[in-house]
């Protein structure tokens, strides 16, 4: 689904009941006779320690997936036999109304959310007992450590705390049209914010000014929450993958790496762009940028339903090696295959090519193996084949991080491939990463990210602003 179509999709309700049916089907794949009730609790209101103010509220993603409800202190029951979904919301607290106004009513919640019934939270135990009495041998499925002490589950034949959480995680991999629409809209908002930073980068003196520009643009477009802490990294700071200081001077530095994106109604976007602060790439920066862009374009061309993500990641390393050979950082005379086999390219591209994206920036279902003895795959967050309907980031990068590269320079196994004298010309490049968000389709992919990444176009925007 192209991003331009998202407004029509988002006119409807978040498809919570469709998601509940998906979860039941996942459970049924291993338990054909599944019966009973799915039980979930939303995030509770929490107070800041030693303070009378509430913590920032963030809904539990497992609860949101089956409700679309962003209210705190709620519960959900889903009767598998009848496919009946009931949301329980807090009743009116007169003292709270003084400060916060009237809360959403049960009728308003029923009109807003894709559920069959809305009741109040003091009714949940009675409702659970009634569901259990209707099917005495049935099971209640819940998530461990997410059941309040006041909840009894009396009358159920069994309590299962093992299957619901992984079932939701599996179901979340393939997105509904509504979910894709939310991610697409978040991408468009984030893309506009990236453009605002491009237009301002030449006129600021500190990273924090660009950080503020990005936040302001997202908030003004209706997305006040970021999907993750923004990375606004000038110069050599861009070699730190998750740099979060965002308060260093920009003067005298070559490039800015901006990894920043908003979330919309609990759904994340995740975009990275790298561009010259002055408006013109240096030859060294342009060589690395072109290599990273080719890494992305060639791996994007491989994407379709059933592609093995490990293979796509390996190809990104091949292109990186070709680019580093062309730049002279890897010594001539060695083959791409030989350098690939040595894993020396991991010094410059140490992370995985991408990750699933959804309600979490690093979304569920990736089956990563962080104990993999092969350094090329240790931080690959998705393993195996990609299903149609999944949303994944494609974010190759090349970095010049002294802390990471120095051990390779001291190890003959790797140092024989690296020309240290040429490498010295590239430290100020810092790091280059380019990241888009794509939906996997049967025969290819749909790129949801609209932020500009053509080198000449970025230079033109910066120089003319």
UniProtKB/Swiss-Prot annotation:
Record field: transmembrane: none
SUPFAM superfamilies per the UniProt record, alphabetical: Creatinase/aminopeptidase, Creatinase/prolidase N-terminal domain
UniProt keyword Plastid present: no
Keywords: Aminopeptidase, Hydrolase, Manganese, Metal-binding, Metalloprotease, Protease
Enzyme Commission number(s) from the entry: 3.4.11.9
Cofactor(s) needed by this chain: Mn(2+)
Entry's Gene Ontology BP terms: proteolysis
GO molecular function: manganese ion binding; metalloaminopeptidase activity
Residues annotated for Mn(2+) 2 binding in this entry: 259, 270, 435
UniProt binding sites for Mn(2+) 1: 270, 395, 435
Cofactor binding note: Binds 2 manganese ions per subunit.
One Pfam family linked to the record: AMP_N
Record's catalysed reaction(s): Release of any N-terminal amino acid, including proline, that is linked to proline, even from a dipeptide or tripeptide
Top-level EC class: hydrolase
Domain of life: Eukaryota
Record PANTHER family: XAA-PRO AMINOPEPTIDASE 3, XAA-PRO DIPEPTIDASE
Function (record text): Catalyzes the removal of a penultimate prolyl residue from the N-termini of peptides.
Family according to the record: Belongs to the peptidase M24B family.
Protein name: Probable Xaa-Pro aminopeptidase PEPP
Organism listed in the record: Pyricularia oryzae (strain 70-15 / ATCC MYA-4617 / FGSC 8958) (Rice blast fungus)
Lineage per the UniProt record: Eukaryota, Fungi, Dikarya, Ascomycota, Pezizomycotina
């Amino acid at each position: 689904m192209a991003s331009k179509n998202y407004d029509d999709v988002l006119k409807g309700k978040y498809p919570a009941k469709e998601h509940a049916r998906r979860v039941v089907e996942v459970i049924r794949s291993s338990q054909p006779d599944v019966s009973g009730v799915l039980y979930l609790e939303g995030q509770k209101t929490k107070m800041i320690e030693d303070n009378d103010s509430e913590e920032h509220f963030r809904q539990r993603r497992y609860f949101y997936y089956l409700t679309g409800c962003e209210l705190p202190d709620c519960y959900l029951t889903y009767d598998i036999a009848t496919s009946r979904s009931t949301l329980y919301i807090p009743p009116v607290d007169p003292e709270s109304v003084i400060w916060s106004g009237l809360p959403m009513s049960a009728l308003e919640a029923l009109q807003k959310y894709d559920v069959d019934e809305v009741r109040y939270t003091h009714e949940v135990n009675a409702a659970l007992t009634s569901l259990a009495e209707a099917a005495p041998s049935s099971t209640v499925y819940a998530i461990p450590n997410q059941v309040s002490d006041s909840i009894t589950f009396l009358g159920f034949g069994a309590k299962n705390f093992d299957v619901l959480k992984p079932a939701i995680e599996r179901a979340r991999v393939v997105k509904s049209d509504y979910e894709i629409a939310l991610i697409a809209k978040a991408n468009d908002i984030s893309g506009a914010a990236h453009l605002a930073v491009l237009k301002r980068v030449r006129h600021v003196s500190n990273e924090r000014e660009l950080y503020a520009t990005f936040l302001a643009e997202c908030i003004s477009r209706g997305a006040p929450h970021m999907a993750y802490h923004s990375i606004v990294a000038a110069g050599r700071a861009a070699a730190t993958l998750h740099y979060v200081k965002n308060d260093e001077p920009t003067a005298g530095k070559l490039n800015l790496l901006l990894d920043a994106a908003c979330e919309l109604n609990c759904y994340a976007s995740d975009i990275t762009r790298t561009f010259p602060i002055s408006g013109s790439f240096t030859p060294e920066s342009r060589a690395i940028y072109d290599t990273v862009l080719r890494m992305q374009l060639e791996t994007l061309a491989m994407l379709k339903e059933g592609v093995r993500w490990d293979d796509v990641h390996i190809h990104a390393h091949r292109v990186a090696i070709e680019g580093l050979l062309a730049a002279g950082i890897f010594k001539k005379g060695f083959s791409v295959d030989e350098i690939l086999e040595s894993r020396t390219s991991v010094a410059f591209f140490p992370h995985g090519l991408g990750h699933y994206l959804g309600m979490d920036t690093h979304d569920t279902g990736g089956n990563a193996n962080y104990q993999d003895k092969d350094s090329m795959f240790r931080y690959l967050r998705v393993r195996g084949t990609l299903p149609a309907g999944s949303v994944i980031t494609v974010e190759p990068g090349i970095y010049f991080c002294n802390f990471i590269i120095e051990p390779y320079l001291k190890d003959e196994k790797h140092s024989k491939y690296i020309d240290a004298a040429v490498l010295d010309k590239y430290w100020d490049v810092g790091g280059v990463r380019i990241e888009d968000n794509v939906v996997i389709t049967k025969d290819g992919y749909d790129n949801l990210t609209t932020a500009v990444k053509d080198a000449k176009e970025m230079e033109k925007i910066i120089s003319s602003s």
